[in-house]
């Protein structure tokens, strides 16, 4: 399973809200020897794969052309809408 991601430059609550209104959501990739990286993911491409068991195993994120093997660590969902607010990924 592979997802395209972009490094996030604007941080904070306002920037996160703008992303969510644009049908995207913020995420972070951490772990290993590298520094944590804030990224942006497309909501529809992720939410359509979340019901599959393979999503919760090792997946590939393509962050600005570089492939990174990660595993979902934490998923923050909207209380009553079928939306993802934020995700944490841990490098494998």
Curated annotation (Swiss-Prot):
Repeat in keyword set: no
GO MF term list: 5S rRNA binding; structural constituent of ribosome
GO CC list: cytosolic large ribosomal subunit
GO BP annotation list: translation
Pfam families to which the protein is assigned, alphabetical: Ribosomal_L25p
Keywords linked to the UniProt accession: Ribonucleoprotein, Ribosomal protein, RNA-binding, rRNA-binding
Organism domain of life: Bacteria
CDD domains named among the record's database cross-references: Ribosomal_L25_TL5_CTC (cd00495)
Keyword rRNA-binding found: yes
Gene3D superfamilies: Ribosomal Protein L25, Chain P (2.40.240.10)
PANTHER family for this protein: RIBOSOMAL PROTEIN L25/GLN-TRNA SYNTHETASE, ANTI-CODON-BINDING DOMAIN-CONTAINING PROTEIN, RIBOSOMAL PROTEIN L25_GLN-TRNA SYNTHETASE, ANTI-CODON-BINDING DOMAIN-CONTAINING PROTEIN
Complex and partners: Part of the 50S ribosomal subunit; part of the 5S rRNA/L5/L18/L25 subcomplex. Contacts the 5S rRNA. Binds to the 5S rRNA independently of L5 and L18.
Family membership: Belongs to the bacterial ribosomal protein bL25 family.
Role this protein plays: This is one of the proteins that binds to the 5S RNA in the ribosome where it forms part of the central protuberance.
Protein name (Swiss-Prot/TrEMBL): Large ribosomal subunit protein bL25
Species for this entry: Photobacterium damsela subsp. piscicida
Lineage of producing organism: Bacteria, Pseudomonadati, Pseudomonadota, Gammaproteobacteria, Vibrionales
């Amino acid at each position: 399973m592979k997802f395209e991601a972009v490094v996030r430059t604007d941080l904070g609550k306002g920037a996160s809200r703008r992303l969510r209104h644009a049908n995207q959501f913020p995420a972070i990739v951490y772990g290993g020897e590298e520094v944590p990286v804030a990224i942006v993911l497309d909501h529809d491409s992720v939410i359509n794969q979340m019901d599959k068991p393979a999503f919760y195993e090792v997946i590939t994120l393509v962050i600005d052309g570089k492939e990174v093997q990660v595993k979902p660590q934490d998923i923050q969902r909207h209380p009553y809408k079928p939306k993802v607010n934020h995700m944490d990924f841990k490098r494998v």
